[in-house]
Each structure stands twice: as structure tokens, then as C-alpha cells.
Amino acid sequence: FGYGHRYVECLQDFYKLCGKTPLLPRYTFGNWWSRYHKYTETEYKELVERFEKEEVPFSVAVVDMDWHLVEDVPPVYGSGWTGYTWNKKFFPNPPEFMDWLHKHGYKITLNVHPADGVRAYEEAYPRVAEKMGIDPASKEPVLFDMTDPKFIETYFEELHHPMEEEGVDFWWLDWQQGTVTKVPGLDPLWMLNHYHYLDNKWKGTRPLTFSRYAGPGSHRYPVGFSGDTVITWESLQFQPYFTANASNIGYG
């Protein structure tokens, strides 16, 4: 309200106050392939080869949540919404698969819903539990808690870094579990965006995360996505308008 129709000046002052949007890696400006589908390694490779044959350029391979165990999670542990263990029925050799994608010019992002923490069926559970001071034999879950520095350290060092060393370039944070933490007013999505962006620098490359809007200041942790949509022409027509309007608070 203080700027009238001086929109550009308003945004310039907003950036001065809240920080500028960091430069993105060059590959992010290419086409991304993303489909909610239970891909197998073979099917994904066939798709990439078809893109190459048809001369359809892509720079990012997105693998949605079925890269990890979902339906095969024992019922005692709840749903398979959260997961960090590759589904070897679909991807029998994850490092080889990601190396193949890299050789074909793709960067790789995996979808994660981290809210359920780490449960005893996960391959990483023993080392995560030990680091958190939990006896692995107890099968006690490691609860997700972005207010706990020890959990944050373990979360990155034991869950994400090993898979990044195998080939994951950045993470698609698909947080949908609310805004409440042990600290009043602290949004877990804000913490996830902040720490994932900072942590993505560890390999010496230009950092990137792929996540939802977590409030003013989210432009400092690019890049964002709209959230779930419906498959209709009306929805597709709305998306450019919706995306362009996000720039009113620097987000994109």
C-alpha cells in the first residue's frame, strides 16, 4: 500500500530487506521430466532413450515417491509415505541407474515426505538410531524433529549424504504435514527449506532445493513448486497466472 503502482521499486526494497534470490544452476532452466507413476529402472531408461530419439531435450529427471518402499512397508510401521530405502523391485541397482542418467545428461531429484522420521524397517535405521542414542534392537522409531540439532545433523549425514554420494543431485521436499513444531511459531517446512538449501552446498556446486512456499523469505531457497494440481485444461490455464503472481513476494 505504501508504493501505489511502483511495483518494481517495492520489490527492489523487499529484496534489500529480505535478501536476494540466489543464482540457480544452469540446468534448472531446461525441461524437467516429472510424472507420478511407478517407474521401473527399465521403463525410465526406455523413456529417456525415446526422448533422445525424438530429440526432446530434458535436463532434470524427477523420480516420484515410488523410488522407495511404499506398499511393501510392514503394516506395523504404518504407511509408506515416508521412506529412504530404495525399492529394489523397481530399481535393483540405484547407483548404476543414476550414473546412467548422469551420462545421458540428466540431473536427478528424488521425492521425499520426511514427516514420519526413520522407522526400523529402513536400511539406514541402525546407524540413525545409534547416532540418536536409541538401541536399534528396540525398533523404536526415530522421530522427525527439525528443532533438534542432533536430529538435523543425523538426518543429513546418515540419510541424505549417502544417497547424494550415489548420485542424487538435489531433493524434492514434498512437505504436507502442517506448520507446528516444538518451538511455537517455527514452521518445519521453513526449517527444511533453509537447511536443505545450505546443506546442498557441501559438494561445492551451486545449491538447489525443490520445495513448497513456507512464507515470506522463501525466495532465498529456490526453487519452488505450486503443489498438487488437477489434470484439467482450466487448471493448466491457471498455472501461469498463479506462478507469475508468486513473484509479487519474490518467490518462484
Range-by-range predicted roles:
Residues 1-252:
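Catalytic-domain carbohydrate-binding cleft regions of carbohydrate-active enzymes
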